């Protein structure tokens, strides 16, 4: 029996059982590719990819020049002000971080690598309580920008050997957000949410139950944050030695990590108290007996506080910009209910307007919604849900008639599920 088979591409005959001469062979269909053809195909693909990347680089450069004129820090903040109440310092920090990211990209495109003075990335860590606007800030920022942006839940990440997602999934998410354009992906932004959930057990914070792999996850993220080549398989493909892989360099990807960091204010207070008692040989400090408020403490976060919380020093060194968000008080929640373009009250008014209904909320009702959110300790996150709970029956019944009506939501509706006041206006 002839031990050779014809290559389906070049028609050259090669030995069937030689993996070196015949790396691709399907005995069922008879399809075969010899080693020479496989090499030629890979070279052709690589040459094509080089041309594609050149075109993508030229397009990215062209877009950068246009983008630089509209993403000045003050313009980014003005845009965020339309949707996010308070958090002015955080808006400034993120606006500058994003603008500098664009400048760093432009500098890289304008100069050859051997001409470059190194401008290091200014990755950002965001701290703030649940519902204070961390995710909202970044989602609106992403809408404004013309660069890929992807969010990954850090709590789902595990180090090799544990069940869960490998850290490479963060880059893979960005790759797909960039429509599989590697050049755009390599200049995008990754947001690692719930970053506090991967704090190590040895930290002073006892409110979390960390898995043994959490410090390992942080170690796995180190090179990615600094800049390295990350290799991953396409979505839906199992990881095995023969699977084709995609390579992305993270050198120019901006990383933003964020979380509630529950309990870090206690670490900060402890540090400040230790410092205060050492001043003036134990002299009493004015207001020393008063319990510091969260908002007074969180803005004083330092790298050593994050280390005591359970973030390893090497990670902190790669997150030079600390951005803190304040807890929202009742006045801030009231403004969030009514002022931004996407304010819950404005949304429901528009929805009811489409059913020929004038929707009104009494001042007491708005205060009741804000107070309920504070009681739940969920910040702005629960505002829409509280209103939705009250509005459900009205939104179900109102479409039964086309009459022009007015619906008034009172504090009694919010607190006791009383029926809203409905008046005919015809």
Write out the residue ranges for each language-model feature.
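AAA+ P-loop NTPase nucleotide-binding core of proteostasis motors
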Residues: 1-35, 44-86, 91, 96-149, ...
């Amino acid at each position: 029996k002839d031990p050779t088979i014809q290559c389906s591409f070049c028609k050259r005959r090669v030995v069937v059982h030689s993996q070196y001469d015949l790396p691709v062979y399907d005995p069922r269909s008879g399809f075969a590719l010899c080693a020479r053809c496989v090499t030629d195909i890979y070279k052709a693909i690589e040459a094509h990819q080089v041309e594609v990347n050149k075109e993508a680089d030229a397009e990215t450069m062209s877009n950068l020049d246009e983008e630089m004129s509209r993403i000045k820090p003050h313009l980014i903040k003005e845009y965020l002000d339309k949707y996010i109440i308070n958090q002015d310092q955080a808006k400034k920090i993120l606006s500058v971080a994003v603008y500098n990211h664009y400048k760093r990209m432009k500098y890289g495109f304008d100069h050859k690598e051997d001409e470059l003075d190194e401008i290091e990335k200014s990755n950002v860590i965001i701290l703030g309580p649940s519902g204070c606007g961390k995710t909202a800030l970044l989602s609106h920022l992403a809408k404004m920008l013309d660069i890929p942006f992807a969010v990954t839940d850090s709590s789902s990440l595990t180090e090799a050997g544990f069940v869960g997602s490998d850290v490479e999934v963060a880059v893979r998410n960005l790759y797909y957000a960039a429509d599989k354009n590697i050049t755009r992906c390599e200049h995008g932004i990754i947001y690692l949410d719930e970053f506090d959930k991967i704090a190590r057990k040895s930290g002073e914070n006892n409110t979390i139950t960390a898995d043994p792999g959490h410090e390992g996850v942080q170690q796995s993220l180190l090179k990615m944050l600094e800049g390295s080549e990350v290799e991953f398989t396409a979505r839906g493909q199992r990881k095995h030695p023969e699977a084709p892989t995609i390579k992305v360099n993270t050198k120019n990807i901006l990383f933003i990590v964020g979380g509630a960091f529950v309990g870090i204010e206690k670490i900060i207070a402890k540090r400040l108290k230790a410092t205060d008692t050492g001043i003036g040989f134990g002299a009493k400090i004015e207001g020393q007996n008063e319990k510091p408020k969260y908002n007074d403490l969180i803005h004083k976060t330092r790298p050593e506080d994050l280390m005591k919380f359970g973030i390893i020093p090497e990670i902190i060194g790669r997150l030079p910009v600390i951005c803190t968000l304040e807890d929202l008080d009742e006045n801030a929640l009231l403004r969030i209910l009514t002022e931004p373009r996407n304010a819950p009250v404005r949304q429901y008014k528009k929805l009811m307007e489409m059913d020929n209904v004038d929707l009104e909320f009494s001042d007491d009702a708005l205060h009741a919604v804000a107070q309920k959110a504070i009681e739940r300790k969920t910040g702005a996150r629960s505002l829409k849900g509280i209103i939705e709970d009250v509005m459900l029956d009205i939104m179900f019944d109102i479409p039964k008639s086309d009459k022009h009506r007015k619906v008034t939501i009172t504090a009694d509706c919010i607190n006791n599920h009383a029926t809203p006041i409905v008046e005919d206006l015809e």
